[in-house]
A protein has these predicted regions:
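Generic detector of leucine side chains in alpha-helical contexts
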Residues: 11-14, 22-24, 50, 61, ...
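Acidic-and-aromatic substrate-binding clefts and catalytic sites of carbohydrate-active enzymes
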Residues: 13, 41-47, 96-98
Length: 148
């Protein structure tokens, strides 16, 4: 089970491989019941709303949902639904007695990493090119289906 801070946190579009990694991460005794998800999947419209707010100086940093990332497949934020129908990012909050460095260290064991400079809480299982390696995840490295 992946703990969320409130019912509005959407995890429905998380890639199944990412979801499995998160479940293993949250089950790890070093972080269990000490960390929760505060932001998950976003629709294009929600990402656009956050970006517009940011551009107007009324919101936090948010990626332009129309920006095509290097490599040409992913758009904008990894929180937003991508062309394959999945989302690849969550924001975490520490709710118990555990340090950021422990959270990051444990997450890395499951192939989940902070990827935005200055945002220790933003975690992804991959970048534009590939999935991050995992010491603790039984990865069977099946090729991703091509999406036109």
């Amino acid at each position: 089970m992946i703990p969320v801070v409130h019912s509005r946190v959407d995890l429905t579009l998380l890639h199944p491989k990412f979801k499995e990694r998160l479940e293993l991460f949250f089950g790890d005794g070093r972080v269990a019941n000490k960390v929760t998800v505060v932001s998950g999947c976003r629709s294009y419209a929600e990402q656009k709303r956050l970006y517009t707010k940011y551009r107007a100086g009324r919101g936090n940093l948010a990626a332009n949902p129309d920006w095509k990332r290097p490599g040409g497949f992913f758009y904008g934020s990894f929180h937003q639904e991508q062309p394959d129908g999945y989302s690849y990012a969550v924001d975490l909050r520490i709710t118990g007695r555990v340090s950021r460095s422990i959270v990051t260290s444990v997450a890395r064991r499951y192939g989940i990493r902070p990827t935005v400079k200055g945002e220790w809480w933003h975690f992804q299982p991959r970048n534009e090119n590939d999935w991050f390696p995992s010491v603790s995840f039984p990865d069977n490295d099946q090729p991703e289906p091509a999406v036109d």
